[in-house]
Amino acid sequence: LNEYKSPFYLYDQEILLQSIRQLYELSDNRVTLLYSVKANPLLYICRLMKQSGCGLEVSSQGEIYLAIKAGVEKSRIYYSGPGKTVFDIQYAIEKGVGIISVESVDELNLINTVALNKNIIQPVFIRINPNYKSKGLRFSMTGVSSQFGIDEEVLNDNFFDEINLLDIESMGKGL
């Protein structure tokens, strides 16, 4: 370690892979583990995550590029986060990103428009910010308006029926 003259990160590949195996075992392989690329956008780590069976959660065009370069199946790339521009969404759809997380009704409509123009049915995951106040917690993302998800009170009874009319495919709803 003395030969390095600057700070660096040291990863133990075996411990990392063992941790991933344990997570899969604990879930009886019923989950899809996603590695958040923004946590450490290194090509080698992304390739390691792919080899271990993880999908990648990305939040920018650069991270989409990195995931594809790492050889991750496009269906296992999940694009999430607020602030996606029309160019970000176009890029994600053009590159064949597996699922795009929807953070607002406007974003849902934008994804639909881009997908329609490209004659693609785009899978989406709709993130809902529930109108629920937790008791006893100091910090909570529920019960307050947030850039992360669609506020529950914005949704009407026909919201999910209307989604079926769009050129998108709802892969699920998350709180």
Where do the language-model regions lie?
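A charged N-terminal "starter" segment
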Residues: L1-I100, V105-Q122, D167
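Residues in well-ordered beta-strands of folded domains
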Residues: S80, R127, G149
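Glycine-rich, aromatic-flanked loop segments that form ligand/cofactor-binding clefts
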Residues: I121-K133
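Active-site loop/helix belt of alpha/beta enzymes
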Residues: P130-L175
